[in-house]
Amino acid sequence: MDWTDTHCRAFHRVLAPSALLYTEMVHANAVIHGDRSKLLAMDPSEHPVALQLGGSDPNLLAQASRISAELGFDEINLNCGCPSDRVQAGRFGACLMREPALVAECVAAMKQAVGSSARPDVPVTVKCRLGVDDDDDFEQFLGFIDSVAEAGCGTFVVHARNAWLKGLSPKENREVPPLTRIASCGRSDFSR
């Protein structure tokens, strides 16, 4: 948190001229009601850059997605991977992996809002984990992917480890659970 602001992304752009850069996760309410000039600051040199959104209300996520697309972001990414206590308390982040129907509803609303914006081709993507806590049922992961893909998500950014919602800090969640090797070739084409 508090790292990938516009200054950090400008530096990353120098290091990686073609990489897709991501913002910090910003809650949909903050996009709608907050100080956009501060929260969504972006220099043209940063492109391509994806806005990472947090939330679980399809209507709020739709409004935030439309605003973000029209502000020039190259991708809108729904974060379903953050394990922090604060994020869980707000019912967004990794805990949403337990609610694939809600995530699908959110993605459908986001895609519809972006599709009717001034920039209808901006993709809506999802960041997720392989599972939550000790749920390591790969079929459950595939069910999540299928459900959300059917709602229109064509790209998933998979953090290849489970998110532990109790007992580990977000930093530990990036280090402690073992990484799982998967190959991604397209919708529902995942293998161990």
Predicted segments, located by residue:
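Flavin-dependent oxidoreductase catalytic cores
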Residues: 1-192
